[in-house]
Amino acid sequence: LGGMALILLITYFIWNLHTLWELFENKTKVENELERSSTLIHCVTELSANQDVDEAINHLLEIINQYFKSDRTYIFEIDEERQIVHNSYEYAAKGVSKEIENLNEVPIQIIASWIKKFEREGSFYISNLDLEKDREDERAYECLKAQNVNSLIAVPLIRNREIIGFIGVDNPRKNYRDFPFLSSVQFFIMNRLDTKA
């Protein structure tokens, strides 16, 4: 009976550990979802409450930057007629250099591979830029390296099924797989940009 009691005790102990682990995982998932929902509401509130479109979008980029614990968050818009992309909005974390002035008229060919990725995949994440060196256009790689970008998330801005730009997040340290969050935000950004036009 002693051996059987020990086996039952060990089984009970293992079952309790398993149950506690599941509760911990569920709690973490709920906390992450709550943070995500709260941040999304904050983004929508910022865009709808602020009458100044530029100011609203800049504040929105700050909120996104904090959510991803990233270095820089920005919006690029495509000018098809001039075959360039320009950095129209940017937020940089404290101690991180702003690049908006350096990226005003970038030839569209530099991001041609990104546009193809947007068309194929919708959004993408580069976890390690050095591992992508052979797959990226050399000029795009050098441009990102010069800005100390090691990883990034990019989600297209879409109007009438046409890619008109993208939102980028440089060096995200948290939530870096949360494409649905950025995709949701891009919808609200497009609505707000349309009111500016």
Question: For each predicted feature, which ranges?
Answer:
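Helix-loop-beta substructure at the N-terminus of cytosolic sensory domains
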Residues: E46-S88, K98, K196
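GAF sensory/regulatory domain recognition
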Residues: Y74-S123
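Signal-transducing coupling segments at domain and membrane junctions
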Residues: Y125-S151
